[in-house]
């Protein structure tokens, strides 16, 4: 897919920041309009993250116009909003390949461009990394500046405040831009704050303020009076007390869609010393009415017709595993008012919208605070309630110590519903759920279940919920379920697998939703196929029986081979001195790049043909 760049006469002159900085300031409004239209035209044809980028067009232009990137370092938190940044940094012609196999990375990525200073994907990392870069720049002594752009959601995470607390303490030169898109800007207050921001960020104000401090330093009562008066005046229009207390000079809020005003304010702030925070107000989805009205639905989009203003409806296929979880959650809460469901800012993605509306007193969105979510669940369990933590595999990594220290050591009955286990797809290395079986399997007291279809998923959620002897996890993938018929809920016997197909010679031990692919291979080579169901406790008895009646065992899982379910089988076989070779099939020892789930599985030999080929090659 290619767009006619002649339709964007100003944008064509700004293929990179050096060209951008040659444009007259008066042309920046037209550039922003064209950049926003280019983003709409491109993403509507290729799919990708959408609403966030529409909201940061003016900020992106202003930052690259004022700062000498890539010498000056610009860091984007999470990266959903960085499409305009990629377009303006030499990647305009490849933007249609974003999130696709062998295409542009979905987030800023160090290996892709010198303008991408930090590889990102998870939230709230920008200020910590930016502070490290700022300290390095001070030691370097070349006058390099550092800017971090972070959203109002990401800044709520503890890591962001830890970094700001440190920055305020060591007084390094660092600009944090808080992109606040939670509310619209009042014209009157916005205009007043824009004017105030230029005054507060200007040289005259800084000189007077510092000079006044020196003059009044020997007169504490007067100095304190002036400080309080200043804070009172700023406080009427500037909600920055918290950031000031952390040691930042706070400027804002300002209109994040006034590119001329942003350029002037950023020019003023670039020369300032110490930690600075610029608070800008933006509209997520800016310039495209449907996305402005419903930015959540338009956050990441498939291909769509921009003239229609609607997203294509998903087919009438099987429900997603997230929806299966959400339905189970609502059904269980209907019979048990002690159920407490927790999510770290992933209500929609985890399938919890209906539950949050039907059972608001039993629903807790703790924001981007994975560590708190897990320990909060521990407290609920101690209090006699039944917590369910719904969390993506890749984000549970951020709360690993809490899982061990606050839940497992105390053997608390917390159920972890782990979504996006295994190959996730288009979001690439930072979002694949490759490691959860490995990092959970080594934790004492933890029960780990891997359903092969939606019915098993429901049964395992039910089993884990009613398991009161300690913590449990149910791990399921992104995407649609298989269409398996749903049975009445009942508890499964712990640590027991099911023989799915009887064959000879080779026994395939499958963990999770690769069962159809494993079945393809089993039929092709007449192998026995087992749905193991439990990673921990393992079905030791069944493994011993299979080892005695087969010449070889093969484990299949959509997790890292190192430390995963197959490693558990290996450990048991060696411990028992069973005389049978074992082949482990799973994710290799490297980070998995983006692509569709089907493409990635085929590349890694995890489709039916690939599993069959790996077994045949091993047996040869």
Curated annotation (Swiss-Prot):
Q: Which Gene3D superfamilies does this one have?
A: 3.40.50.920, 3.40.50.970
The residues that the entry says bind thiamine diphosphate are 80, 121-123, 153-154, 181, 288, 370
Q: Which organism is it from?
A: Sodalis glossinidius (strain morsitans)
Protein's recorded name: 1-deoxy-D-xylulose-5-phosphate synthase
Tell me, in a sentence or two, what this protein's role is: Catalyzes the acyloin condensation reaction between C atoms 2 and 3 of pyruvate and glyceraldehyde 3-phosphate to yield 1-deoxy-D-xylulose-5-phosphate (DXP).
Q: Which gene encodes it?
A: dxs
PROSITE patterns with a match to the protein in the record: TRANSKETOLASE_1, TRANSKETOLASE_2
Name the needed cofactors.
Answer: Mg(2+); thiamine diphosphate
Please give the biological process terms from Gene Ontology that the record holds: 1-deoxy-D-xylulose 5-phosphate biosynthetic process; isopentenyl diphosphate biosynthetic process, methylerythritol 4-phosphate pathway; terpenoid biosynthetic process; thiamine biosynthetic process
InterPro entries referenced in this protein's UniProt entry, alphabetically: Dxylulose-5-P_synthase, THDP-binding, Transketo_C/PFOR_II, Transketolase-like_Pyr-bd, Transketolase_BS, Transketolase_C, Transketolase_CS
């Amino acid at each position: 897919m290619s767009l006619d760049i002649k339709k964007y006469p100003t944008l064509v002159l700004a293929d990179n920041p050096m060209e951008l900085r040659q444009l007259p300031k008066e042309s920046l409004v037209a550039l922003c309009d064209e950049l926003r239209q280019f983003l709409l035209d491109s993403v509507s044809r290729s799919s990708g993250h959408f609403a966030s980028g529409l909201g940061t067009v003016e900020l992106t232009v202003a930052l690259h116009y004022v700062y000498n990137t890539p010498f000056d370092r610009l860091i984007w938190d999470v990266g959903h909003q960085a499409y305009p940044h990629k377009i303006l940094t030499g990647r305009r012609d490849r933007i249609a390949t974003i999130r696709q196999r062998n295409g542009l990375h979905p987030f800023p990525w160090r290996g892709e461009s010198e303008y991408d200073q930090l590889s990102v994907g998870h939230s709230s990392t920008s200020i910590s990394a930016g502070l490290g870069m700022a300290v390095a720049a001070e030691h370097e002594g070349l006058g390099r500046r550092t800017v971090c752009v972070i959203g109002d959601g990401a800044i709520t995470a503890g890591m962001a405040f830890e970094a700001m607390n440190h920055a305020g303490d060591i007084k390094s030169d660092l600009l944090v831009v808080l992109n606040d898109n939670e509310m619209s800007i009042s014209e009157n207050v916005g205009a007043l704050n824009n004017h105030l921001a230029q005054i507060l960020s200007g040289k005259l104000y800084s000189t007077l303020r510092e000079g006044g401090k020196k003059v009044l330093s020997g007169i504490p009562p007067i100095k304190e009076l002036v400080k309080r008066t200043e804070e009172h005046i700023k406080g009427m229009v500037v909600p920055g007390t918290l950031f000031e207390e952390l040691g930042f000079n706070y400027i804002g809020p300002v209109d994040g869609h006034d590119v001329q005003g942003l350029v002037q304010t950023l020019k003023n702030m670039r020369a300032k010393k110490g930690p600075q925070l610029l608070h800008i107000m933006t509209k997520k989805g800016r310039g495209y009415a449907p996305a402005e009205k419903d930015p959540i639905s338009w956050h990441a989009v498939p291909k769509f017709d921009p003239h229609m203003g609607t997203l294509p409806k998903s087919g009438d296929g099987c429900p997603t595993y997230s929806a299966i979880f959400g339905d189970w959650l609502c059904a269980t809460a209907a019979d048990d008012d002690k159920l407490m469901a927790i999510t770290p800012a992933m209500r929609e993605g985890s399938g919890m919208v209906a539950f949050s509306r039907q059972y608001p007193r039993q629903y807790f969105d703790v924001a981007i605070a994975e560590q708190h979510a897990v320990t909060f669940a521990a407290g609920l369990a101690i209090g006699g309630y039944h917590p369910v933590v719904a969390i993506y595999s890749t984000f549970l990594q951020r709360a690993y110590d809490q899982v061990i220290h606050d839940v497992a050591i105390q053997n608390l009955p917390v159920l972890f519903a782990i979504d996006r286990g295994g190959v996730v797809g288009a979001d690439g290395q930072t979002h694949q759920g490759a490691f959860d079986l490995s990092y959970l399997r080594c934790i004492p007291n933890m029960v780990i279940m891997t359903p092969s279809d939606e019915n098993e998923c429901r049964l395992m959620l039910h089993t884990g919920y009613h398991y009161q002897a300690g913590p449990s996890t149910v791990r399921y993938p992104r995407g649609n379920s298989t269409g398996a018929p749903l049975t009445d809920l009942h508890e499964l016997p712990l640590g027991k697998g099911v023989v799915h197909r009887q064959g000879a010679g080779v026994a395939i031990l499958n963990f999770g939703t690769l069962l159809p692919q494993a079945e393809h291979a089993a039929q092709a080579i007449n192998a026995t196929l087992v749905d193991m169901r439990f990673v921990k406790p393992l079905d030791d008895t069944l493994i011993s029986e299979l080892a005695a009646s087969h010449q070889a065992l093969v484990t299949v899982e959509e997790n890292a081979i190192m430390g995963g379910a197959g490693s558990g089988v290996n450990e048991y076989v060696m411990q028992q001195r069973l005389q049978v070779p074992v082949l482990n099939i799973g994710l290799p020892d490297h980070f998995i790049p983006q692509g569709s789930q089907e493409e990635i599985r085929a590349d890694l030999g995890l489709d039916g043909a690939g599993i069959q080929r790996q077994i045949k090659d091993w047996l040869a």
